[in-house]
């Protein structure tokens, strides 16, 4: 079966865990099947999936587990770190599995400049045998994706898309201007309507862990420029509820509360008790479900 990677909605999936921190495969499959049922593309081992808190063997086990389920939606795998050789080894492993595409983040911690970024991304793209989505998220990496990366690599056969999560609408528009054939996805749930106005074609979402069906409708309306201002506010509230403390703490808390996964456990350095209560999530859940009931 051919998989279309140009899904308008990808869910950046959490990695469910037992209280002892081991991966909860039963909850993981439950979460994956829910996303598959709604037709959402799936991103595993991104920051929401706590990829860097898992060792290499665990990461490989996650990829094997997910791909062996033979889901009928596209599977994207996160590529991110500091040591280039390890990222290339990771890509090499993933390409032995049924992985459809990669999410490749700007190198972490080092804050590389234009030339360094371009060299890094070219090396990764050359290694990849799958379409790649670059990822600009300066709040996590400390640096924006350099414009030179796009001007230099926009015609690379393995460069497919960009996830833009700087929160800067004009920057997103500039990236689209520099690489007009690049498919740009919003990495900011609450900004999708505004980013759609400058050419964004989809969303890589955190909140769709909780509300996959409703988020699909939100994406549909946003990309069609049909979402009302009052409705947009609802999705801004929903987004804030999932980012009141560091992601994925709130999302895991709600999924455990609602019985989708067994616990809200995270790996160090994150602790579940940073979220003091569920009041924001309870309020957002009510708003989102009421909005959807009137569609």
UniProtKB/Swiss-Prot annotation:
Gene3D superfamilies: Aldolase class I. Its main location: cytoplasm. The active site is at residues 135, 163. The keyword Phosphoprotein does not apply. It comes from the Bacteria. Keywords: Amino-acid biosynthesis, Cytoplasm, Diaminopimelate biosynthesis, Lyase, Lysine biosynthesis, Schiff base. GO terms for molecular function: 4-hydroxy-tetrahydrodipicolinate synthase activity. It is found in: Cytoplasm. GO terms for cellular component: cytosol. Coiled coil: none annotated. GO terms for biological process: diaminopimelate biosynthetic process; lysine biosynthetic process via diaminopimelate. Homotetramer; dimer of dimers. Catalyzes the condensation of (S)-aspartate-beta-semialdehyde [(S)-ASA] and pyruvate to 4-hydroxy-tetrahydrodipicolinate (HTPA). NCBIfam families: dapA. This is 4-hydroxy-tetrahydrodipicolinate synthase. It comes from Francisella philomiragia subsp. philomiragia (strain ATCC 25017 / CCUG 19701 / FSC 153 / O#319-036).
